Amino acid sequence: MAEITWFGHASFQVEIAKKIVLIDPWLDGNPMSPVKASEISKADIVYVTHDHGDHLGDAFNICKRTNATFVAAVELGDCAEEKGVRNVAGLNIGGSVGLLVTQALHTCARGAPTGVIIEGEGKTVYHAGDTGLFGDMRLLGELYKLDVALIPIGGYYTMGAREAAEAVRLLKPKAVIPMHYKTFPVLAQSADEFVRMVRENMPKVKVVVLKPGESYPF
């Protein structure tokens, strides 16, 4: 069985195929995170969707302490090596090292903003990264038959509830977990509107609203 744990904002731990994958591990300074970076004792892969501080977070330090492989866009991978991270895989969109890098509509200074698809144990997880809505989400859903989609809903910097609900319609996951909300005052403070829209329009999709620190086995 695979399991996803939410640390608040866009930070997740995915346990799948006997691997621990951390995504966007912004823990120290994250007002929603129930754990500190120093409490992460094991990780196999750390994936960072883009270089904004609320996503890159503690990734370098966690990789150096746990010997996890840092995976991100090429330019951000170069930065990781400069910071002393030993195991680095710098990829472009479409590239894969067991994780598939996907596009995201956002901004960043180093490399392209990305999402990621993780496969293992016959399960597939999609973390959309910080993104707006884009039509090729339909293609991702058709190609990868998603078990779980992790979707930003907070608005302002990413999709809001309406666009995120449409993303769910395009992706057609079995389950969706909302993220990237409530952390800052400018973001949506609740997932209620998103939950209502998905349940009304895609009733077959399971909406899983986690509290920080909670896990979803699948």
Q: Where are these predicted regions, by residue range?
A:
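Zn-dependent metallo-beta-lactamase
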Residues: 1-20, 27-30, 193-205, 209-214
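Active-site-proximal beta-strand elements of phosphoester/diester hydrolases
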Residues: 3-6, 21-24, 99-104, 124-130
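Pre-active-site segment of Zn-dependent metallo-hydrolases
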Residues: 13-52, 57-64, 75, 105-109, ...
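Active-site environment of divalent metal-dependent phosphoester hydrolases
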Residues: 29-30, 52-57, 77-80, 95-98, ...
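Glycine/small-residue-rich loop that forms an oxyanion/phosphate-binding "nest" at active or ligand-binding sites
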Residues: 49, 57-107
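Binuclear metal-ion centers of metallo-dependent hydrolases, dominated by the metallo-beta-lactamase
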Residues: 81-96, 163-165, 169-218
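Active-site-proximal loop/helix segments of hydrolase catalytic cores
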Residues: 105-170, 193
